[in-house]
Amino acid sequence: MASVEEIRNAQRAKGPATVLAIGTATPDNCLYQSDFADYYFRVTKSEHMTELKKKFNRICDKSMIKKRYIHLTEEMLEEHPNIGAYMAPSLNIRQEIITAEVPKLGKEAALKALKEWGQPKSKITHLVFCTTSGVEMPGADYKLANLLGLEPSVRRVMLYHQGCYAGGTVLRTAKDLAENNAGARVLVVCSEITVVTFRGPSEDALDSLVGQALFGDGSAAVIVGSDPDISIERPLFQLVSAAQTFIPNSAGAIAGNLREVGLTFHLWPNVPTLISENIENCLTKAFDPIGISDWNSLFWIAHPGGPAILDAVEAKVGLDKQKLKATRHILSEYGNMSSACVLFILDEMRKKSLKEGKTTTGEGLDWGVLFGFGPGLTIETVVLHSVGTDSN
């Protein structure tokens, strides 16, 4: 008879969790930031608020965003005008749209990841789904499992309303699942649609205007597993360690409340300072065991909460300008897609590294860090190890 220790050892993988494939997707509807103030005040019937529109235009100009993809169209707003009001009851119709569309957008990204992975979907043992858009039972994880035709026995984890740090959360969760279940292949999906947060302008809610200028829609999927079979699987990044912490006395710094009017967001003006002043402590705790203290020796995948956050982090830890280039590129091309952002950046980094002939998937560097920031104020830190591009 086997002992409990023998059983536990047999259940565990031998090597670290590894990202084996990445896929991304967006809605078709693309809005350019240079035109967005005009569009936003027109579709929300707010063109009479001329001074507020000027403020919003300045916010858009400073956002460093070129374009975003948004599921919500002008036609949908005409049909459901309460969504475009500042504080009109609209949760029912928002929920109807979101609960249908979030799994569909997630499916598009998942299919791309599954195609890159190249293995039968029956080999997916676990599904981790994350969204800040909508809540229902059974959840978006259940709907996605059915849309993809995954096995009924797939072990599902559904994460709702984690916010912008959750790209790190899902990787941390997938790491634990992959390393503690030998042979596990974990499909991770983040799908975000801003239908839940879109609303018209108000003089009394400038933080809401910041959100309207920054957030976009997108979904990203990764497949994670330990001990890859290199004859049929291509490792991209190893997940070496993962940690989460929150900054004391900062619960209201980034906050969201689900109400009859949708999901309302509130931001403190000092969010960039709070994050930048606490990030080095996270770096030190993560990289002391490895013996790394030069933050410019790492490749960086940071959630692009906004240009002010990136500028503050860059200055505080003394980063070279090119370190956040991939992050700034995704912010420019897609806006802030909440939990999906860091996975988009991961995809951008490995593709650009290959295209530019770098020796590793991490811009030619071996070690990297992935950061997520969000409500709490919560910080997720994932230590990454890149893979040689000759194996890809």
UniProtKB/Swiss-Prot annotation:
Coiled coil: none annotated. GO terms for cellular component: cytoplasm. It catalyses: 4-coumaroyl-CoA + 3 malonyl-CoA + 3 H(+) = trans-resveratrol + 4 CO2 + 4 CoA. Substrate binds at K55, F56, N57, R58, L267, G305, G306, P307. Its EC number is 2.3.1.95. Keywords: Acyltransferase, Cytoplasm, Plant defense, Stress response, Transferase. GO terms for biological process: biosynthetic process; defense response. The keyword Lyase does not apply. The active site is at C164. Belongs to the thiolase-like superfamily. Chalcone/stilbene synthases family. Homodimer. Mediates resistance to pathogens which are sensitive to stilbenes. This is Stilbene synthase 4.
